[in-house]
């Protein structure tokens, strides 16, 4: 199954084609044609064959529809209700997820939803603080991937690289002893709920004063409305997230990222599996 890309750090977009809609339409069209042939067109060809004493050839479109419908239907069900693959094309979730990672997103962790339309069919669970989640931002049809930081009703404050939730500072410690190959990265670890999240900021030098500064991204204070979530990228200084475009409504949830199953940055590279892991 082809993997969709998610979350370009500057624009946080992936692709203009609505693949679930295309897949649903293709499945419906081939299914209707296959059903019509079973109920009516096939019988008519059989009558014509007996009348003219020769076999009437099955039209190409019917032949192809009957061949593709079972495959399309299976893919549609799996991608809609079980799991869906995505590709990470940027660094807004570094250091945990890097450009070229292929991830598997569970479609049932937060309940079963109507394909394309997003209406909840069966409620199973709710997002937890620290989950890595795929979703649609408000008023944007493109897929994003971020970490759940704020739950409905939470008071969120982010200043001087310190995250505070409901008046309590989130435990943060620098990752000492971890090799940092890129000199502009500042790494730390946050404890969000039951998750330990590795995060990073951009370290730069002020051209006017030559002083070292760490760009931690937009700061502010927010109250999460009911039925919404506050999302942040792990790469705090290079992520367009709820700090800039607001809260994610529950109906926009796509699924929970559960595993990295391959790394393949470009067509000229060889796919690797050394980053494969389950995500906490």
Features from the language model and the residues they span:
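Soluble "head" domains of membrane/secretory-pathway proteins
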Residues: 2-44, 53-57, 61, 86-87, ...
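Internal/C-terminal transmembrane anchor helices
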Residues: 52-83
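Short surface loop/edge beta-strand patches of beta-sandwich-type extracellular domains
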Residues: 91
